[in-house]
């Protein structure tokens, strides 16, 4: 929000300097980003009147002018501007004057007594561009007729004015106008507020335009009036152009300038239609698929049922609350207009402009909420200015109210406000603060029931009112005290470890932590989760961040691509974050949203060489078993099962479902070749994703005696059908450990696999495979005898033979 200080002080004029006012606004939550002068420094530039103009004797494009600059003597100045003429008043740079430098950082341009083609020139007549007031260099800057000759140009044009630029938070829509800032300034400083002088215009016509509001959920109130006989070619007054330019808005034409001026003044966007281009009445409705509209910016957009429009009997005329259409735009030939000011529901405007990749001042205001009680007053204000500047005759205001917000009172407890703010603020002082803010309230003990005014869409809950009390009371008045808390020794739950410890464990295994958005591209959800119906955002910050993620895989691959594009050769990253899944069984709670599960997961990705390139080890790409080892180390001492299964994002033959205590807790595997090709990856990364709960839970450490006796190791090779999974054999051997004969078995590990090849069978048929296991046995009480070991091995083999038809390989 940008505005000149002089405009603000027409509404409220606190006894503060510019810097003090800036500080007061910033400390109340209206952050002043910058203060800059309305014009660069100048010296000895005054108002002059051109008395006479004659052609230069030796140059066709130059004129010799006689100028009265209030110095007591007529000055002769050579000028080449095409619009120089006797009688006009212009800025005159006297000899010795200093103009702003041509380039930023350069030296000021000094005016000297000089000769141009043999004719002496005693100064220079200036354009607005030469004074750095605008980019207009078409000719001299013509000043209003009433400007006193000889007056310093800085005084005449108020060039010592200061332009404020304020960075507003999204909730402060009520401050998107000069009057809104003035209202806040009055509340902050206690200075009196002068409301705009808005008087109803006498209706000289009886004509109204038929208006139908077909979508009350789009438009709650629509006010308008017909004005005939306007002069669209009228010149916008200098004071209005000056205020608009200092607010960052260039002058277009009188009708457009007036509409923009009132928007900056009062915060109400409005629209002026060319009445003669409207076919019949107008209808405020939702758009229809297949309709199109050419906008004022020249773009033609395709409409659908999610955007609001204003249409007539023949065509769509305007994109409701965002931008007018080209077909009914006013021009310099317009004589009859229809003026409109409406209340558009914020939800019906929010995000619609971004949908078409542009933004407007109107959409910026309406999507945040604009006062719904003042549409008629603002129509009167615009009408007043149009009749004063462009002339014409106005009809009556047609005000249609169909659906306005019902603002329920918001309660605030003074005791809670004091507890949150941290200082004792008396109830009478709180009442005074609410009064200064224009918040109507009722008191019941220490409870204030505040009815939010129509211009405050940000007041909905108790904390909103506490914020208002704090910022008007003054954050600077709140003493800075260090927090005091009693130290308390809490018992440590040894059955759980923190997510912080897990992150440290991953970092110790050479993974770097990354943090990504929880909202992702819808295409990622299809690719990495097989999800065609993700949780969609109503108001995404970008089109490629439109859905909530249900897996971390997409985010990790995105980080991988980002690093590969920067020539990284080895990438190992992890993320601890939430995913969002639609689940009707979830009930609303303090940390839960009804209908949506938000489990926390940990995902990791490894890509490139297992270790950094070195002379002592051959380079090898990371594989499934490397990452599986990292995951097992992370889960230890909890054992995990890895069950062959398919996942949309993973290689069908190199992926597994992770199970702990019989429950599926995650996935591990190599990226699917289809996705590797789609995302242009030279090698397939290996990834895992696991529920955080499975990692934080752990059994209490159980001490066991270290055996003094040597372990016994036996290798066995069993032949099974190729369809039998290794994990299934491990599961059966684990069950066998419950047998008394296997009580000394400490560990079983697979160390070899053999399958028949074309040139050698190894005694196996084509559908068989040989698996070699190393069984480690140990007794803490004594050395194991061969009979005990043989019995344990035979029990394991018998178990596999009975269930899967396994046989010892000869």
Swiss-Prot record:
**CDD domains associated with the record:** PheRS_beta_core, tRNA_bind_bactPheRS
Q: Which InterPro entries match?
A: aa-tRNA-synth_II/BPL/LPL, B3/B4_tRNA-bd, DNA-bd_dom_put_sf, Fdx_antiC-bd, Fdx_antiC-bd_sf, NA-bd_OB-fold, Phe-tRNA-ligase_IIc_bsu, Phe-tRNA-ligase_IIc_bsu_bact
Enzyme's top EC category = ligase
What is the organism field in this record? Burkholderia pseudomallei (strain 1710b)
In terms of superkingdom, the source organism counts as: Bacteria
The upper taxonomy is: Bacteria, Pseudomonadati, Pseudomonadota, Betaproteobacteria, Burkholderiales
Catalytic function, reaction form? tRNA(Phe) + L-phenylalanine + ATP = L-phenylalanyl-tRNA(Phe) + AMP + diphosphate + H(+)
Q: Name one GO cellular component term.
A: phenylalanine-tRNA ligase complex
Query: What does the similarity note say?
Result: Belongs to the phenylalanyl-tRNA synthetase beta subunit family. Type 1 subfamily.
Question: Which UniProt key words apply to this protein?
Answer: Aminoacyl-tRNA synthetase, ATP-binding, Cytoplasm, Ligase, Magnesium, Metal-binding, Nucleotide-binding, Protein biosynthesis, RNA-binding, tRNA-binding
A GO molecular function annotation here is: ATP binding
Q: Indicate the segments forming the FDX-ACB domain, all copies.
A: 707-809
BP-aspect Gene Ontology terms: phenylalanyl-tRNA aminoacylation
Q: What is this protein called?
A: Phenylalanine--tRNA ligase beta subunit
The B5 domain sits at: 405-480
> What cofactor does its activity depend on?
Mg(2+)
Principal subcellular localisation of the protein: cytoplasm
* Cofactor binding annotation: Binds 2 magnesium ions per tetramer.
UniProt-listed PROSITE patterns: B5 (PS51483), FDX_ACB (PS51447), TRBD (PS50886)
Q: How does it assemble?
A: Tetramer of two alpha and two beta subunits.
Cellular compartments annotated: Cytoplasm
Q: What is its EC number?
A: 6.1.1.20
* UniProt cross-references to SUPFAM superfamilies, sorted A to Z: Anticodon-binding domain of PheRS, Class II aaRS and biotin synthetases, Nucleic acid-binding proteins, PheT/TilS domain, Putative DNA-binding domain
């Amino acid at each position: 929000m940008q505005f000149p200080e002089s405009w603000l002080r027409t509404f409220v004029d606190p006894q503060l300097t510019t810097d003090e006012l800036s500080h007061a606004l910033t400390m109340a939550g209206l952050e002043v980003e910058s203060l800059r002068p309305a014009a660069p420094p100048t010296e000895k530039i005054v108002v002059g009147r051109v008395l006479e103009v004659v052609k230069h004797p030796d140059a066709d494009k130059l004129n010799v002018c006689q100028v009265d600059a209030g110095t007591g003597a007529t000055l002769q100045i050579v000028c080449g501007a095409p619009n120089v003429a006797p009688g006009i008043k212009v800025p005159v740079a006297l000899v010795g004057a200093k103009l702003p430098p041509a380039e930023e950082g350069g030296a000021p341009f000094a005016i000297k007594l000089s000769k141009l083609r043999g004719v002496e020139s005693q100064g220079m007549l200036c354009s607005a561009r030469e004074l750095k007031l605008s980019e207009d260099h078409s000719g001299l800057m013509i000043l209003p007729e009433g400007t006193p000759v000889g007056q310093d140009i800085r005084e005449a044009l108020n060039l010592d004015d200061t332009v404020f630029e304020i960075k507003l938070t999204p909730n402060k829509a009520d401050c998107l106008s000069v009057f809104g800032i003035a209202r806040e300034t009055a509340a902050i400083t206690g200075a009196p507020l002068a409301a705009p002088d808005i008087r109803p215009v006498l209706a000289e016509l009886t004509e109204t335009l038929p208006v139908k509001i077909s979508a009350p959920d789009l438009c709650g109130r629509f006010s308008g009036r017909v004005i005939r006989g306007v002069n669209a070619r009228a010149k916008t007054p200098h004071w209005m152009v000056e205020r608009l330019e200092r607010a960052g808005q260039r002058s277009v034409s009188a009708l457009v300038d007036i509409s923009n001026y009132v928007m900056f003044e009062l915060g109400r966007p409005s629209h002026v239609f060319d009445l003669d281009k409207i076919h019949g009445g107008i209808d405020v409705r939702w758009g229809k698929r297949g309709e199109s509209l050419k906008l004022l910016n020249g773009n033609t957009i395709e409409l659908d049922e999610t955007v609001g429009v204003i249409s007539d009997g023949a065509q769509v005329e305007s994109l409701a609350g965002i931008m007018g259409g080209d077909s009914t735009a006013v021009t310099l030939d317009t004589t009859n207009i229809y003026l409109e000011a409406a209340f558009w529901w914020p939800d019906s405007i929010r995000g619609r402009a971004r949908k078409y990749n542009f933004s407007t001042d109107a959409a910026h205001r309406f999507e945040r909420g604009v006062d719904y009680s003042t549409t008629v007053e603002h129509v009167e204000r615009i009408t007043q200015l149009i009749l004063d500047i462009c002339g014409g005759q106005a009809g009556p205001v047609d005000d249609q109210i169909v659906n306005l917000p019902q603002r329920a009172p918001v309660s605030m407890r003074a005791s809670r406000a004091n507890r949150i703010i941290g200082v004792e603020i008396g109830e009478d002082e709180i009442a005074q603060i609410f009064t200064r803010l224009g918040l109507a309230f009722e008191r019941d003990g220490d409870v204030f029931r505040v009815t939010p005014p129509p211009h405050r869409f940000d007041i909905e809950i108790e904390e909103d009112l506490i914020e208002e009390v704090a910022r008007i009371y003054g954050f600077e008045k709140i003493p800075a005290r260090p927090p005091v808390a009693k130290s308390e020794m809490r018992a440590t739950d040894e059955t759980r470890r923190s997510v912080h410890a897990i992150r440290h464990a991953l970092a110790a295994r050479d993974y770097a932590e990354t943090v990504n958005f929880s909202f992702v591209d819808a295409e990622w959800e299809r690719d990495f989760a097989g999800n065609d119906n993700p949780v969609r955002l109503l108001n995404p910050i970008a089109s490629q961040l439109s859905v909530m993620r249900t897996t971390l895989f997409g985010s990790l691959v995105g980080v991988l691509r980002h690093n590969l594009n920067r020539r990284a050769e080895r990438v190992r990253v992890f993320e601890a974050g939430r995913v969002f899944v639609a689940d009707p069984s979830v009930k609303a709670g303090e940390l839960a949203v009804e209908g949506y599960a938000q489990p926390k997961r940990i995902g990791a990705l490894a890509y490139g060489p297992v270790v950094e390139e070195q002379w002592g080890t051959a380079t090898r790409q990371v594989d499934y078993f490397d990452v599986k080892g990292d995951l097992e180390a992370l889960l230890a001492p909890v054992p995990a099962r890895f069950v062959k299964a398919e996942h949309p994002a993973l290689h069908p033959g190199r992926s597994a479902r992770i199970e702990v205590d019989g429950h599926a807790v995650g996935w591990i595997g190599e990226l699917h070749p289809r996705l590797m090709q789609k995302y242009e990856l030279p090698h397939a990364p290996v990834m895992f994703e696991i529920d955080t709960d499975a990692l934080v839970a752990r059994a209490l450490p159980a001490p066991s005696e270290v055996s003094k006796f040597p372990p016994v190791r036996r290798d066995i090779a069993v032949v099974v059908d190729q369809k039998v999974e290794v994990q299934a054999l491990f599961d059966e051997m684990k069950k066998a450990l419950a047998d008394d004969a296997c009580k000394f078995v400490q560990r079983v590990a697979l160390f070899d696999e053999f399958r028949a090849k074309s040139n050698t069978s190894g005694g196996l048929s084509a559908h068989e495979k040989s698996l070699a296991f190393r069984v480690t046995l140990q007794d803490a009480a004594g050395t194991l005898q061969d009979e005990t070991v043989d019995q344990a091995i035979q029990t394991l083999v018998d178990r596999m033979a009975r269930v899967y038809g396994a046989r010892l390989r000869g």
